[in-house]
């Protein structure tokens, strides 16, 4: 029906058209297979049209169909699809070239096919020439294309059955793979659920780990603050200790000075007692010393002024202590000067007054020194209390710090252990998750490979099935064409038979006239008619299958002793009927046409006898056939007639088939050649 071109079309936009034939028969639907490249997104607005080759615009299409959008599209793999053009929309047969074009929704041509034609099959297309080499000799066989197509149809049917079995096996494998995929999906779902649970646990552990880390950071900061506070307290304690030491040193100095002053006071008291004793002794001299006493009162007034000045300078106690020492030295000097005044009353009274004044001053200074000492002692006591409080607080803080350190160490050790345990668990879970992910990935890869292989096998099966269907359609169309031609041949055959009957009637009239003129010739022709193949008409009518003559061969063996009884008419010239092999029975084949073929052969035999007996009568009877048929018929008989007329060697008038023992005239080589091949 059509000759397929398995080469793929060159693609301008990536779309490849597969199995595009060079010719298509009209009035039969056309199936178009194409492949979209990876990355192409098919749309329901895309369409495939049949265009003329010279068409320059997408609107110049003859017909089109919308493209089919696949249900499942795999990323990274080509998409195979097919569409069908109905027979009523196809172009009319002719020499015009067409091609498929894929147009996307933007109106851009994404691919085109090789050109093809729509035409009816020609009569010469129904014959196929086969060349075979057998035993070193080339044999050229010309057989009907229907036989070849029938063989191809049988092979396609067998291949289709094999493909169906393979499809069933693949469907079984697909079912098994689907069950395996479902099991793997269930396992994957369980693994994902377990992975989700592990992820939740991991998140919980991560949150707890984060909280513990934050607590650890807070404790670390608190520890740093406590350590800084402890360092500050230690520095404060060190400073206070230094201050306490300084105060103690200063207190020791004050105590030493107080002791010295106390000793001096005792000395002064002893001197005062001595002075009082001297005073009692010098009362007599008191009057003499009144004037000196007035002067001493003035000095006392001056001393009071100085006392006021010293009270103003009470805050500068430390400086006045030195002045007191100087004053005490002066007092001592003055006391030392009092001894010579014992003799002199005035000097003694003056010294007594001054001593009293100085004693009062010293008493006040001692009182202020005692107050300062008490204040210093109170401050020292307060400092000691502060130091004791600070030490107690420091001890408490140190104890609390030690407790916090021990507790923090314990918590840190526990946290480290828990973190290590969680890390181990996380590592184990990560390894398990990686293993599961790897297994799932491998299963996905295998399932993807299986799906790809199944899709490829399915596509190839669909393509082969569509090819088989297309070839089957072609074969059916060819068979319909053959049936039509067979009907035409039958009609022509019927016309030829009618024409042969008319010729037979004319030949019978001519033969009657000729036989009435020459009885001897009539008897001879009757004898020859009994022995020639035309006498086998009855047997051929009884068995029409024997009239199917296969290709020619030569029967070399003959039996000369099996000839019938000879008579006086044997020496007369023989009328040889050359009977070529019929062509119509080989082409038609059915057994019910054999009877009509045998009748046609009888008519041809009579016609050939008439032609060989006289060319003029044949020309009168067959004006339509002309001289060509006469030359062909007379050519078969010229050889035997020439040999008989030249008086060659005597040969038996009959030949016998070694298989069926059927007898033939010696000179009918063509019929013998044809008959022998019926047994081959």
UniProtKB/Swiss-Prot annotation:
Q: Which residues get modified to Phosphoserine?
A: 4
Upper lineage is:
Eukaryota, Metazoa, Chordata, Craniata, Vertebrata
Question: What GO biological process terms does the UniProt entry carry, in alphabetical order?
Answer: positive regulation of transcription by RNA polymerase II; Wnt signaling pathway
Q: Which residues bind Zn(2+)?
A: 657, 660, 675, 679
Q: Which Pfam families match?
A: CALCOCO1, SKICH
UniProt-recorded Gene Ontology molecular function terms: RNA polymerase II cis-regulatory region sequence-specific DNA binding; transcription coactivator activity; zinc ion binding
One cellular component (GO) term of this entry:
cytoplasm
Q: Which residues form a coiled coil?
A: 145-205, 232-339, 417-514
What is the name of this protein? Calcium-binding and coiled-coil domain-containing protein 1
Protein's cellular compartments:
Cytoplasm; Nucleus
Q: Which organism is it from?
A: Bos taurus (Bovine)
Q: Read off the domain note.
A: The C-terminal activation region (AD) is used for downstream signaling. Seems to be essential for coactivator function with nuclear receptors and with the aryl hydrocarbon receptor. The N-terminal activation region (AD) is necessary and sufficient for synergistic activation of LEF1-mediated transcription by CTNNB1. Contains a EP3000 binding region which is important for synergistic cooperation.
Task of the protein? Functions as a coactivator for aryl hydrocarbon and nuclear receptors (NR). Recruited to promoters through its contact with the N-terminal basic helix-loop-helix-Per-Arnt-Sim (PAS) domain of transcription factors or coactivators, such as NCOA2. During ER-activation acts synergistically in combination with other NCOA2-binding proteins, such as EP300, CREBBP and CARM1. Involved in the transcriptional activation of target genes in the Wnt/CTNNB1 pathway. Functions as a secondary coactivator in LEF1-mediated transcriptional activation via its interaction with CTNNB1. Seems to enhance inorganic pyrophosphatase thus activating phosphogluomutase (PMG). Probably functions as a component of the calphoglin complex, which is involved in linking cellular metabolism (phosphate and glucose metabolism) with other core functions including protein synthesis and degradation, calcium signaling and cell growth.
What keywords are assigned to this protein?
Activator, Coiled coil, Cytoplasm, Metal-binding, Nucleus, Phosphoprotein, Transcription, Transcription regulation, Wnt signaling pathway, Zinc, Zinc-finger
- According to the UniProt record, where is the region C-terminal AD (CTNNB1 binding site)? 501-680
Region Interaction with GATA1, annotated ranges = 45-125
User: Quaternary structure per UniProt?
Assistant: Part of a calphoglin complex consisting of CALCOCO1, PPA1 and PGM. Interacts with the bHLH-PAS domains of GRIP1, AHR and ARNT. Interacts with CTNNB1 via both its N- and C-terminal regions. Interacts with EP300. Interacts with CCAR1 (via N-terminus) and GATA1.
Region p300 KIX-binding, residue ranges: 1-30
**Region called N-terminal AD (CTNNB1 binding site), residue ranges:** 1-190
Task: List the InterPro entries.
Answer: CALCOCO1-like, CALCOCO1/2_Zn_UBZ1, SKICH, UBA_autophagy_assoc_protein
Q: Where are the zinc fingers (UBZ1-type)?
A: 654-679
> Region (Disordered) spans which residues?
511-606
At the top level of its lineage, which domain of life is listed?
Answer: Eukaryota
């Amino acid at each position: 029906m059509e000759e397929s071109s398995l080469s793929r079309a060159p693609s301008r936009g990536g779309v490849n058209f597969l199995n595009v034939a060079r010719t298509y028969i009209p009035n039969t639907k056309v199936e178009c297979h194409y492949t979209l490249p990876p990355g192409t997104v098919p749309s329901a607005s895309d369409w495939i049209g049949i265009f003329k080759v010279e068409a320059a615009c997408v609107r110049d299409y003859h017909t089109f169909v919308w493209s089919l959008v696949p249900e499942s599209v795999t990323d990274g793999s080509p998409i195979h699809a097919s569409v069908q053009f109905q027979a009523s929309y196809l172009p009319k047969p002719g020499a015009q070239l067409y091609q498929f074009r894929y147009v996307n929704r933007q109106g851009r041509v994404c691919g085109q096919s090789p050109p093809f034609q729509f035409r009816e099959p020609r009569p010469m297309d129904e014959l196929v020439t086969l060349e075979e080499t057998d035993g070193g000799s080339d044999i050229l066989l010309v057989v009907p294309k229907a036989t070849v197509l029938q063989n191809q149809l049988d092979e396609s049917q067998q291949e289709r059955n094999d493909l169906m079995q393979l499809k069933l096996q693949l469907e079984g494998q697909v079912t098994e793979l689907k069950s395996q995929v479902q099991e793997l999906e269930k396992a994957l779902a369980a693994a994902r659920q377990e992975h989700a649970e592990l992820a939740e646990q991991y998140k919980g552990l991560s949150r707890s780990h984060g909280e513990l880390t934050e607590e650890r950071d807070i404790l670390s900061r608190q520890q740093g603050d406590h350590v800084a506070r402890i360092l500050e307290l230690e520095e404060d304690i060190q400073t206070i200790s230094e201050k306490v030491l300084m105060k103690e040193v200063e207190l020791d100095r004050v105590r030493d000075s107080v002791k010295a002053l106390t000793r001096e006071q005792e000395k002064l008291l002893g001197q005062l007692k001595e002075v009082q004793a001297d005073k009692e002794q010098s009362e007599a001299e008191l009057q003499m010393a009144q004037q000196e006493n007035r002067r001493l009162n003035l000095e006392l007034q001056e001393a009071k002024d100085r006392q006021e000045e010293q009270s103003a300078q009470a805050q500068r106690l430390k400086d006045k202590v030195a002045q007191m020492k100087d004053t005490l030295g002066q007092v001592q000097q003055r006391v030392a000067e009092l001894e010579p005044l014992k003799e002199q009353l005035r000097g003694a009274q003056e010294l007594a007054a001054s001593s009293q004044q100085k004693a009062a001053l010293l008493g006040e200074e001692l009182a202020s020194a005692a107050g300062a000492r008490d204040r210093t002692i109170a401050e020292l006591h307060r400092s000691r209390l502060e130091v004791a409080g600070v030490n107690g607080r420091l001890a408490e803080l140190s104890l609390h710090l030690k407790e916090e350190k021990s507790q923090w160490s314990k918590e840190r050790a526990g946290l480290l252990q828990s973190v290590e345990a969680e890390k181990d668990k996380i590592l184990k879970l990560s390894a398990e998750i990686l293993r599961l992910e790897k297994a799932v990935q491998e299963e996905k890869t295998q399932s993807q490979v299986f799906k790809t292989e199944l899709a490829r096998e399915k596509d190839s099966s669909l393509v082969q099935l569509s090819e088989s269907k297309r070839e089957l359609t072609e074969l059916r169309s060819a068979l319909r064409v053959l049936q039509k031609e067979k009907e035409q041949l039958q009609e022509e055959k019927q016309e030829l038979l009618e024409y042969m009957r008319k010729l037979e009637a004319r030949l019978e009239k001519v033969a009657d006239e000729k036989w009435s003129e020459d009885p001897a010739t009539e008897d001879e022709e009757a004898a020859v008619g009994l022995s020639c193949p035309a006498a086998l008409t009855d047997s051929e009518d009884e068995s029409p299958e024997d009239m199917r003559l296969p290709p020619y061969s030569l029967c070399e063996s003959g039996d000369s002793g099996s000839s019938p009884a000879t008579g006086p008419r044997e020496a007369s010239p023989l009328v040889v009927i050359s009977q070529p092999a019929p062509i119509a029975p080989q082409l038609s084949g059915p057994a019910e046409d054999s009877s009509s073929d045998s009748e046609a052969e009888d008519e041809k035999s009579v016609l050939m006898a008439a032609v060989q007996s006289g060319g003029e009568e044949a020309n009168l009877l067959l004006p339509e056939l002309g001289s060509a048929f006469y030359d062909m018929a007379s050519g078969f008989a010229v050889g035997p007639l020439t040999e008989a007329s030249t008086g060659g060697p005597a040969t038996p008038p009959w030949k016998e088939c070694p298989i069926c023992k059927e007898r033939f005239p010696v000179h009918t080589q063509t019929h013998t050649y044809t008959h022998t091949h019926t047994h081959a």
